[in-house]
Amino acid sequence: MNRLFRFEDPKIMELFDKRFISSIFKKVSVLEKCVSRVEEASGLRFPEYYIEPILPVYFDNSGGIAVYYARTIPYVAPSGLDIVIQVSAAMLKYGSKSSIEAILAHEFLHYLDLVRRISKFEIVSDEVRGSVFETLYSDLEKIIKPEYVYADRKLVRTLKKKFADGFEDEKLKEKTLSDWINKGKPIIQLSPEENMVRIPVSTILASKFDPILLLRIREIEKKAGLA
């Protein structure tokens, strides 16, 4: 997958100056190194991912703001169900290497849990609503503990520290607010309810995943007491 395909849209390019876009492109190598570390620590291949130029945010009634720096998104592809990680350009632009690694490692846990639940059809029984033949998957719901997945203890410590109570990085948050949101760079407002993806049950039932990935997930389940 072309990580930067969203920036090929002329309408997107008009939203940023050339210098800013160039700075994003230059940090792609940092993103790739962070992905490699997650892969090495887990012994698994990271799913496809791309950089999203429009920042998803949520404003609550009390004036607080939540930023979706990355999201795990299942979607219906021509070949069946597929899963992609959406990485925000804001995170790539303003995030430190340790924060980018932590966010990617966190999303990878969401990815593994989603594959686990779909492969066992748990997501069907959990989330089909009423008589509507579709299921809802929330990116914020369930997650596998990092120590069951990652052999890299430093990465596990960083992940637990950064996500002790939601994601915590004041410097990244301040830069995102001051240099992205307050300066009018593109955002899309998503409530927690809207940050959900509808997946047809027929697609879930026909889903196929890499046998090696499923075997590793079963090993993780045993460690976590989920088997």
For each predicted feature, which ranges?
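A short, highly charged nucleic-acid-interacting micro-segment common to nuclease
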Residues: 16-30, 126
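Short alpha-helical catalytic segment bearing the HExxH-like zincin motif
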Residues: 99-107
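Active-site scaffold of zinc-dependent metalloenzymes
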Residues: 58-98, 111-115
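Acidic/histidine-rich, surface-exposed loop or edge segments in extracytoplasmic proteins
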Residues: 5-19
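Post-HExxH zinc-binding segment in Zn-dependent metallohydrolases
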Residues: 116-168
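Pan-zinc metallopeptidase signature
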Residues: 4, 153-227
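Long, charged, glycine-rich C-terminal linkers/tails
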Residues: 49-58
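Zn2+-dependent metallopeptidase catalytic core
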Residues: 24-47
